[in-house]
Amino acid sequence: MDEQTYALATKAAWYYYMEDNTQAQIAEVMGVSRAKVIRLLEEARAQGIVQFSFRKNDSQRVSAEQLLIDRFGLKDAFVVPTPLDSSAINQSIAQGAAHYVSDHLREDGYLNIGYGDTVSRMLGFLAKNREESLNVVSLTGGVSYYLPSVGTTAYSMHLFLTPSPLVVSSRQVRDALLDEKSLQDVSTMTEYADMSVVGIGAAVEGATVLRNGILNEGELTVLKMQGAVGDVLNHFMDKDGNLIQTEIEDRVISTDLDKLRQLKNVVG
């Protein structure tokens, strides 16, 4: 049993044995079929997860997930183990995200993806390990940021990418591009996708936006002085989640945050 399946089996067992939920209720909460819940409960017993007590690490993981759900009003949460090498954290999260998406995305479903290092890595894992072909729709411009993660496995994916840069030279250029039918068609597709996965970037030294040359250090410093703590889809926000209106915001070709909130099953 791989680590991700082990985590799902642990979660299902917690809901069933510790919180006394029915299998149907667990299926609804976890977004899987009842048959899948039954298999996970069987795996939990077979692997010794359920022994009329919970192993400390397993209990801590599910408790952490439930705390996140309760604190932020989430539909679900998935906690992955912290790797021994801290530099591999994005890789670990990407693997967990790929497993989560694969478990919850129907065979012929459409997946929206946003810009970010972890999302890019996740897409690579999905492309290599998912048996069914993928239908992928981009939530931002910047084709060059999506294709490298797919590599030679692109043949197994149907890619619908926004044909534009992520950041352009002026607001006028952005507005002109957004009027193009090719961009509008992709934007419309995002509204009907089954799931969306976006990266949550931090406004820190070594941020993806710096490594990829989207912003320079001076621009990021100005954003931080204005209260920026991170970004989603290259929209920078303060600690309370409020959008920071800047000149850079006027040049970004990206799904706006109000629209993102309306999409189905957003995973960050």
Task: Kindly give the residue locations of the regions a language model identified.
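Conserved phosphate- and dinucleotide-binding cores of soluble alpha/beta proteins
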Residues: 3-13, 17-25, 31, 36-42, ...
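N-terminal active-site beta-alpha-beta segment that forms phosphate/nucleotide-binding
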Residues: 17, 21, 30-32, 39-42, ...
